[in-house]
């Protein structure tokens, strides 16, 4: 046996190339097979107008949108709409929640199993919510950000795939068992 060329890799180089290859395969796999079936939207009275603007923008991107309310500016309780959206969420579906600050509605949504709701304020946080945290619900504060920023953040959220890898290990650690 004659070896004409020997290529030596350090441990770190081999690890880098292996991880880079897995990332490319993962992105291709997700890009080919990951399909968003529906995007559920819900808000309280403070988020009603922004929710409607987001609904039209998301429809314009070609997604099927399900508006769970509220349907006017009359005062309602944000937990009711967070719980409603969380109860409808299923695999390959995402959610968009809006209240005055986004804080209360995101806290309420995160009380549900299999909901990872991220309160986002821009495209960067929305993209990383998906890429690093595999968030399936995004929350906005209508009194905190404008429609333009919310729309661009929602688009980034919906178009970004979960990176997996080291982030998958971390996401698995989020779920805690009661009493431990």
What are the roles of these predicted feature ranges?
Residues 38-39, 92-95, 114-116:
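Short active-site oxyanion
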Residues 98, 104-139:
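Mid-chain, well-packed structural core segment of small domains
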């Amino acid at each position: 046996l004659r070896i004409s060329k020997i290529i030596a890799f350090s441990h770190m180089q081999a690890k880098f190339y292996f991880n880079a290859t897995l990332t490319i395969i993962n992105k291709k796999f997700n890009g080919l097979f990951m399909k968003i079936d529906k995007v559920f939207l819900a808000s309280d009275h403070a988020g009603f107008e922004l929710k409607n603007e987001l609904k039209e923008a998301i429809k314009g991107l070609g997604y099927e949108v399900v508006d769970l309310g509220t349907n006017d500016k009359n005062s309602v309780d944000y937990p009711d709409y967070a719980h409603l959206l969380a109860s409808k969420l299923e695999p390959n579906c995402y959610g968009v929640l809006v209240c005055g600050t986004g804080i209360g509605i995101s806290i309420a949504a995160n009380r549900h199993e299999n909901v990872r709701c991220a309160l986002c304020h821009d495209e960067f946080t929305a993209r990383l919510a998906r890429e690093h945290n595999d968030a399936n619900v995004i929350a906005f504060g209508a009194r905190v950000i404008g429609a333009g920023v919310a729309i661009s953040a929602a688009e980034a959220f919906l178009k970004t795939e979960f990176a997996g890898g080291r982030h998958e290990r971390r996401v698995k650690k989020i779920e805690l068992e009661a009493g431990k």
